[in-house]
Amino acid sequence: MERFLTKMPIKSKANEVPKKEAVAKKETPKVARKATKKDTPKELKDKENAGDDNTPKQTKGRPGRPAAKRKNLDTPDVKDEKIAMEEENPPKRRSSRLTRSTRSMAEDGSPSPEKEKPEKLPFIKYKGAIKYFTESQDIAASADDVLQWVEKQKDDVVPMAFDMEWPFSFQTGPGKSSVIQICVDEKCCYIYQLTNVKKLPAALVALINHPKVRLHGVNIKNDFRKLARDFPEVTAEPLIEKCVDLGLWCNEVCETGGRWSLERLTNFIAKKAMDKSKKVRMSKWHVIPLDENQLMYAAIDVYIGQVIYRELERREKVKIKNEEEFKEKNGDAAFKAMKTLGETFLTKINEVTL
């Protein structure tokens, strides 16, 4: 019988761990539970004493000295959290290395360069006459007067600033051509409102097609195309062939690039600012009569166009003269070399400085 009996291992009392101590080691520190129906106040007290291993021990000291205050585990330590954040995201150090520009400024003792502020230009002030017409017969009479004035001029070319206005709606798009403004003399601008005009007067068509008249403006070709769509008595192609786009002409004379708006061209050539108020620009140009702001806006557009034309004409003459004088003194090879370096010859150059 003994061989069929298995010997059961006898547990040593020395290896036994008290139940309460084992539970205390495994359990994490916890907040005392709320009393339930099954727990008695005495049992709750025993459980708190058994599981609360994080309670700080009282330090030995003089009798009567209060024990250290217990930390609230539920409230995070703000100081520790700040230190942890600084360790994760250390503050960026400013590089002490000097670049080429900062080194030169440090040696010279000059302050660091500031961002250039845009130059404040004075606004255009037009003090000339504004002749405003709304009826077809009045427009015809005015255009005929200008036509006679053009024919009396001795010059072969009579520059005339030309511009148009029309209403625009984001729902319906651009409306019909409503205003034509012209300027042949900086002292007078003509504004023709076409709301009541079903067909352009013959005198106005003859004026803009006159062989001596050179119409000019910014993006003027698109104006002629729109005018021809709205009024079939106008043919766009002959007007486009003889007109002058001031932006393209500026690129040729000043050797600049890109597309120009009238506002930017005014800043660059005339050193003036334009008040391109959206309230006026997007206003109801077909409504009669135009108010003072609309009349001034329309007049300034062609007035400044005439000013820009005269200035570009003057610069072109200076440029041609300087180029010819330079070629005579230094030869074609030197002239080509200077052009390669980006010289515009808008100012006089006597000798080659390569």
Swiss-Prot record:
Enzyme superclass (EC): hydrolase
GO molecular function: 3'-5' exonuclease activity; metal ion binding; nucleic acid binding
Residue ranges of domain 3'-5' exonuclease in the record: 149-314
Matches recorded under Gene3D superfamilies: Ribonuclease H-like superfamily/Ribonuclease H
Keywords: Exonuclease, Hydrolase, Magnesium, Metal-binding, Nuclease, Nucleus, Phosphoprotein
Bias (Basic residues): 59-70
Entry's Gene Ontology cellular component terms: nucleus
Protein name: 3'-5' exonuclease
UniProt lineage: Eukaryota, Metazoa, Ecdysozoa, Arthropoda, Hexapoda
Gene symbol of the encoding locus: WRNexo
